Amino acid sequence: MTIDAVDEEFASRFAERFAETWRTPDLAKHEALWSEDIVLTQPMMGTVRGKQACREAFARLFALVPDLHADVHSVGHGTNQVFIEFTLSGTYGGKPIAWDAVDRFTFTDGLIAERVSYFDATPLVLKLVGRPRGWDRLARTGAALFGR
């Protein structure tokens, strides 16, 4: 697998697509950004490999927070990476929930080859378990969502 070079124009265009994709929890829009052998790493899910595994992980996430969306704050890039700072938010257990993250992306043929998410999971986990109205949904999706 060859990693694509990244310049400011590519980073800007990708950040716009990322922002558009996250305006609504539409799994098909997310899938359109992924390479077949994408690798996704984030604090609560560990590492997920392949488009099918990512599809399943995102489906569980959207089942837990059906109105999940993101607001992009900034974008940066290196020679072969894009960094996006954003806030994810939605409704869980009848109340708003939000957390900040920074993701690092690498690309193959213009599609995401690797996505590494950086965020402090502790406040998010405390909110998830601290809202009894969401426990049923958490019980149905949480074990699989947080499994490693």
Residue ranges with predicted function:
Residues 79-88:
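A short hydrophobic beta-strand element
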Residues 69-70, 97-103:
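Short, surface-exposed coil-to-beta transition loops
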Residues 1-32, 135-148:
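Short, low-complexity N-terminal intrinsically disordered segments enriched in polar/charged residues
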Residues 103-129, 135-137:
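Short beta-strand edge/turn micro-motifs at domain boundaries
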Residues 63-64, 89-98:
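Short, cysteine-centered beta-strand-loop-beta hairpins and adjacent loop/turn segments enriched
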Residues 27-79:
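A solvent-exposed, acidic/Ser-Thr-rich amphipathic alpha-helical stretch
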Residues 34, 88-90, 119:
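Short beta-strand segments enriched in hydrophobic/aromatic residues
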